[in-house]
A protein has these predicted regions:
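Catalytic cores of the polymerase beta-like nucleotidyltransferase superfamily
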Residues: 1-418
Length: 418
């Protein structure tokens, strides 16, 4: 085991809900530690989400100790040794130490154990195989601490065998590298992912979607996605052409504008050129209706936006709304190869912040006075007037609006002359 180190930057170990759970589970011959992502992120000074706990205690003992301490327990996966304890409305998954007796794909015949090293060896990557006890001492049975220091994502054990256990680990390898790694992906892991690419086809769309969405917004997404493309690993996921250049362009544009990473927007840059691509991705990744609509809108004639003048941009913004306008324009920017500091693109994309979209000022009453009654005719005249108002660049003066209304009625009457 690698020499342990003390984790000082983890106040949640000293007080709060996690510390309480550890205190309840420790003692009388049993030990509990925080494991996995929380330890990794604490060591990397990254935000910590869920805190998972492993223990030598069997599930029944976990439940009985929780009950005695007044802590709610939920047997969420008790057949696998997992009990969820809820403290101050925060859930903690507590899992009894396990070791594989026999593995076959994602399935494994496991036995509860008391060996921390055997439990750590079941995890996927070395940086996820660390544990920390209540005193803040980090225990490393798999070589994770040197990999944390090097920001290196490495499989525990033989990469090919670990991938064959669950082919989702191919996507996890790149996603974890994009989130926490540095430089090129670990060579042995990378080659094993390429060799095992055929296994991606058997994964459920829901599981693939989860990893793809997390990958899209990771800090190192550009490098990871490029490595996947070079290894032939994007085609089995997206099923069609992909565009790493525009993907990099979208990331650069988001950063230049100070925007939060958006998974769907980045996915559009990577894999959507026309609206049919959005429909294909929706099926392959089980996208929500809202996500599909966003992708579909991005792919709709985005190429018409690149050379707009300011007046045309205002009309597009009026028709599309701020979100669809920005998304579609950013796709055009990313696909144009334009520099992220290009003033013209920046001006177009930031138009919604600089210009308030006005409401169309003409109403039904304005046309009733001109002999147009409620009904289909009114709708057609209003549409003609709105088009003319946009073409005139949104005038607000009374005389201009009167002229637009008169012209719309005259055109309608001319077009519908018996």
């Amino acid at each position: 085991m690698t020499d342990a180190r003390v984790l000082d930057a983890a106040p949640w170990l000293r007080s709060g809900p996690a510390a309480r759970v550890l205190a309840v589970l420790n003692g009388d011959g049993e030990e509990a530690r925080v494991v996995g992502g929380a330890v990794r992120n604490a060591l990397l000074a990254a935000p910590i989400g869920d805190i998972d706990i492993a223990t030598t205690a069997l599930p029944d003992k976990v439940i009985s100790r929780a009950r005695a301490a007044g802590i709610k327990s939920v047997p969420t996966g008790i057949e696998h040794g997992t009990v969820t304890l809820v403290v101050e409305a925060r859930p903690f998954e507590v899992t009894t130490l396990r070791e594989d007796v026999e593995t076959f794909g994602r399935k494994a015949r496991v036995a509860f154990g008391r060996d921390w090293a055997r439990d750590a060896e079941r995890r996927d990557f070395t940086i996820n195989g660390l544990s920390v006890d209540a005193a803040g001492v980090v225990h490393d049975h798999v070589g994770g601490l040197p990999d944390i220091a090097a920001r290196r994502v490495r499989f525990i054990g033989d990469p090919a065998r670990r991938i064959a256990e669950d082919y989702l680990r191919i996507l996890r390898f790149f996603r974890i590298h994009a989130s926490y790694g540095s430089g090129e992906p670990d060579r042995a892991g990378y080659l094993a992912c390429i060799s095992g690419f055929a296994g991606l086809a058997a994964l459920s769309a829901e599981r693939v979607r989860m990893e793809v969405m997390k990958l899209m917004i990771a800090d190192g997404a550009e490098g990871a996605v490029t490595a996947m493309a070079e290894g032939g690993l994007l085609l089995p996921i997206f099923g069609s052409v992909f565009y790493t250049g525009p993907f990099a362009g979208m990331i650069a544009a988001e950063r230049a504008l100070g925007l939060e990473p958006n998974a769907i927007r980045r996915l559009g840059a990577l894999a959507v050129a026309v609206t049919e691509d959005a429909k294909r991705l929706s099926g392959r990744l089980r996208l929500t209706n809202q996500e599909t609509k966003k992708l579909d809108s991005m792919g709709h004639r985005w190429w018409r936006l690149g050379g707009m003048d300011e007046a045309t941009a205002r009309r597009r913004l009026y028709r599309l709304g701020a979100e669809r306008y920005r998304d579609r324009l950013m796709l055009a920017w990313a696909r144009s190869g334009g520099e992220p500091d290009c003033p013209r693109w920046r001006e177009l994309v930031t138009l919604p912040e600089r210009w308030s979209v006005p409401k169309f000022p003409l109403k039904a009453a304005d046309f009733a006075a001109r002999g147009i009654a409620e009904g289909p005719a009114l709708g057609q005249v209003l549409a003609l007037a709105e088009d003319a108002w946009l073409a005139a660049d949104f005038p607000a003066g009374e005389s201009a609006l009167e002229a637009i209304a008169d012209h719309a009625v005259a055109r309608f009457n001319r077009d519908h002359r018996p």
